[in-house]
UniProtKB/Swiss-Prot annotation:
Residues 17-141, 183-288 form the EamA domain. Coiled coil: none annotated. The keyword Transmembrane helix applies. It is a multi-pass membrane protein. This is Uncharacterized transporter HP_1234. The lineage of its organism: Bacteria, Pseudomonadati, Campylobacterota, Epsilonproteobacteria, Campylobacterales. It comes from Helicobacter pylori (strain ATCC 700392 / 26695) (Campylobacter pylori). Belongs to the EamA transporter family. Keywords: Cell membrane, Membrane, Repeat, Transmembrane, Transmembrane helix, Transport. One of its GO terms (cellular component) is plasma membrane. InterPro entries: EamA_dom.
Length: 298
């Protein structure tokens, strides 16, 4: 049991490192490609890699039972919108702040679950979520960096859409193999990104920019790191309880800070640092009951 949990923890740490590397590569390419193009290149590379792996490690592509397609399509759409909003913020603001906005998903999940899943909300959980909301307000300061109304809006949207994707994943387990969900997400996002590149959308899609020689490397690395991150994430949740894995996901913010500083981001000021700290505390407090429950079983 302990070895399995240790393996799961190792997997989530590797997943967060890979996602941090992917975000750094997206920031590098953001000077040339639009967020929509980065979504497409990230997704199409991931799709090709998954298709290459499939013959060596096949899995069930058909659903276990009927009724899951609409939920899968919804997961693809909200997951894609979350990625698009996140990639926009990576271009405009510091990597740490963009990542912090995205990692607010558990806070929104707490607030949305009573409405969407009819789950009863505990007072302690609500207080934890409110702490996180205060953190969001602190990092949404227009006087800091380039965090304007659009960046704040995109940041909140990225967190909300990620939370909706997580909520949907709970139901999808009954219908599809986990690997099939990953492939469907990658393929669906490739289609959405491809169509989106031909539509002029302010801030998000500004036409098609033909990849230069040096861009091929960055595009490949974005896809490879994103695919590895997704696989490590899947294996983490397959080998260890979610209550133990979920709190560790916040190390992604640390990688966002470190890679951002390496790429030239300024260090967060006191107000933004406090906001990120509150978001971290909020997520940990939300996950704490499940964490303690799982630790007692060891």
């Amino acid at each position: 049991m302990r070895n399995t949990i240790l393996f799961g923890v190792s997997m989530i740490l590797l997943a967060n490192l890979c996602f941090g590397i992917m975000s750094a590569f997206v920031k590098i390419t953001a000077d040339y490609f639009s967020p929509m193009e980065n979504v497409f290149y990230r997704s199409i590379t991931m799709t090709l890699l998954l298709l290459l792996i499939y013959p060596f490690k096949p899995y069930r592509l058909k659903s276990y039972k009927q009724g899951g397609f609409k939920k899968l399509a919804f997961r693809v759409v909200v997951g894609g919108l979350a990625m698009l909003a996140f990639f926009y913020n990576i271009e405009k603001i510091s990597l740490a702040t963009a990542t912090a906005f995205s990692q607010c998903a558990p806070i929104y999940t707490v607030l949305l679950s009573p409405l969407l899943l009819k789950e009863k909300l505990k007072r302690s959980t609500l207080i934890s979520a409110c702490i996180g909301i205060v953190g969001v307000v602190l990092i949404s300061d227009p006087s800091v960096e380039n965090v304007g109304p659009v960046e704040i809006f995109m940041g909140i949207l990225s967190g909300i859409f990620v939370s909706l994707a997580y909520i949907t994943l709970r139901d999808l387990r009954e219908y599809y193999d986990k690997q099939a969900v990953i492939l469907a997400f990658a393929f669906g996002m490739s289609l959405l990104g491809l169509v989106g590149m031909f539509i002029d959308i302010p801030f998000l899609s500004t036409g098609i920019h033909v990849p230069r020689k040096e861009d091929i490397l960055w595009i490949s690395l974005i896809g490879i790191s994103g695919t590895l991150g997704q696989y490590f994430l899947t294996y983490a949740y397959m080998n260890a309880p979610a209550g133990i894995i979920a709190p560790i996901e916040y190390t992604r913010i640390v990688w966002g800070l470190l890679f951002g500083l390496y790429l030239g981001d300024t260090f967060l000021d006191l107000k933004s640092s406090l906001g990120v700290a509150l978001i971290l505390c909020s997520g940990l407090l939300i996950a704490l009951p499940a964490l303690l429950k799982e630790l007692k079983k060891i």
